[in-house]
Amino acid sequence: MRVLILGSGVIGTTTAWYLAQSGCEVTVVDRQPASGLETSYANAGQLSFGYTSPWAAPGVPGKAVKWLFEQHAPLSIRPTRDLRQLAWLSQMLRNCTAERYAVNKARMVRLSDYSRDCLNELRASTGLEFEGRQLGTTQLFRTQQQLDAAAQDIEVLAQYGVPYELLSPAQIAQYEPGLAGGGAQMAGALHLPEDQTGDCRLFTQRLADLATQAGVQFRYGQQIERLEHAGGEITGVQIDGRLVTADRYVLALGSYSADLLLSLGLHLPVYPLKGYSLTIPIVDAQRAPTSTVLDESYKIALTRFDERIRVGGMAEVAGFDLSLNPRRRATLEMVVNDLFPGAGDLAQAEFWTGLRPATPDGTPVVGATPYANLFLNTGHGTLGWTMACGSGRYLADLMQGRTPEIDTEGLDVFRYLSTRSTRPHREAA
């Protein structure tokens, strides 16, 4: 079976790997000169299998109004003329109930839990290295209210057997001794020991190298223009003015996936959540994070690489704007100085922004479409790397006609389509 994958970020590349391992003839197309150079380039560096939660949560609508007037708010909304922004925000608000939050979080944890197992198997079988650590995430709560609100998340963790440990303020330094050098006061913390860290760009590019050795063809520097279709199937993709054909197609273009589907009559509610990061060279390892620390107040993660600290987070609903906002840099620097003062050289930090492809309910869109030979793998939001291996392997199984190893309920695009939309009949490859 010949498969054409559109997009070579961490999602497209992991999908290519698992399809190649399944015996498919795989080609990956991307506009960049290498894999992992857009949203995967400088994300927060987290593999947050335990800390998997939708942004659409109870209390967020009220907080969003408050955040409009705060300098260091974790979420900001900049209205555009794009009506899809308004529609996406409206759908997100409808998912901010306790009932919808529980359903959405359970779906996300299910996929993340599976993805952890897939990643561990991948590392064991290939020896893939990406400056990774397996020392967990420590989620910091500055207020008792935040600590109390974590109770619902802990219920879901317990339901899925995800290990966790609640920490008193005095216990936090056992996992992150560098925090002792800061002046921030904490009400407590949640430690998730199975979470991991690393450089997503390194992971993506080194996996692309392994995939190339396995026979995958990567075609870089090529512009994907449109999907051609007839009779309920994709007949090819216009790339740099020529038609490229395959037996099956995978759309893994992140925030740009929705535009390509419009000509097919599919309205995919994937919208960019703009995030920022700083990559800081370490000058004092004793003051630096040991693994990943997540500041619940500012939704900012501080992650340790070998000789660098990656500080990332925040979410701007601002369309496809890739400009660098100096106010966001100030927020990142403020959190670093508050938690790990003197750990890194901020003057030498690399400031970056990327567009995370987010759905209104937080769950990605992975699976079949009404077009018999078109599959989607997008909409992972802030958890693309966390869910990448599980999403890629699940999709490879689905496309090969094998029964997936996890419950697929609520993962594909059909949860957003009208009841008149039908799933295409498929035969095993």
From Swiss-Prot:
Species of the source: Xanthomonas campestris pv. campestris (strain B100)
Catalytic class of the enzyme: oxidoreductase
Cofactor: FAD
Any single Pfam family the record assigns to this protein: DAO
Binding, FAD: 3-17
Taxonomic lineage of the native organism: Bacteria, Pseudomonadati, Pseudomonadota, Gammaproteobacteria, Lysobacterales
Keywords: FAD, Flavoprotein, Oxidoreductase
GO biological process, one term: D-alanine catabolic process
Sequence similarity: Belongs to the DadA oxidoreductase family.
Gene3D superfamilies (UniProt xref): D-Amino Acid Oxidase, subunit A, domain 2 (3.30.9.10), FAD/NAD(P)-binding domain (3.50.50.60)
UniProt protein name: D-amino acid dehydrogenase
Biochemical pathway: Amino-acid degradation; D-alanine degradation; NH(3) and pyruvate from D-alanine: step 1/1
The encoding gene: dadA
